[in-house]
From Swiss-Prot:
Pfam families: Rep_fac-A_3 (PF08661)
Family: Belongs to the replication factor A protein 3 family.
Database matches in InterPro entries: NA-bd_OB-fold (IPR012340), Rfa2 (IPR013970)
Gene this chain is encoded by: RPA3B
Entry protein name: Replication protein A 14 kDa subunit B
Subcellular locations according to the entry: Nucleus
Coiled-coil region(s): none
Described purpose of this protein according to its UniProt entry: As part of the replication protein A (RPA/RP-A), a single-stranded DNA-binding heterotrimeric complex, may play an essential role in DNA replication, recombination and repair. Binds and stabilizes single-stranded DNA intermediates, preventing complementary DNA reannealing and recruiting different proteins involved in DNA metabolism.
Length: 106
């Protein structure tokens, strides 16, 4: 496992803390346009992901990339997470990874 450039676990609210840094987020795809995907974060905020994932897209995607603004990620890696995903648990993971247990996450 490459730990030289870790990606912070983020939801919509946490994204603004990491502008210019590598992040990972799970989104529910709302729509896909040329060069971007519009999605809903696990805390119900809209996120724009720049880039073009390989079709077909599933309902949930994990995106790893650089946070450009408080609601935009420039994607480097896209991973289909299927059509069913526990967004509440992932949202809690984001809170833990950015809170008192941050030291446990790369």
């Amino acid at each position: 496992m490459d730990t030289s450039s870790p990606a912070a676990f983020v939801n919509g609210a946490l994204l603004r803390r990491y502008i210019g840094q590598k992040v990972r987020a799970v989104i529910q795809v709302i729509r896909s346009d040329v060069g971007s995907v519009i999605g809903k974060s696990t805390d119900d905020q809209q996120i724009v992901v720049k880039g073009s994932p390989q079709p077909p897209l599933t309902t949930y995607l994990e995106v790893i990339g650089i946070a450009e603004t408080d609601n935009t990620i420039r994607a480097e890696v896209w991973t289909n997470f299927g059509d069913s995903f526990d967004v509440q648990n992932y949202n809690e993971l984001c809170k833990l990874a950015n809170g008192e247990f941050r030291h446990l996450f790369i």
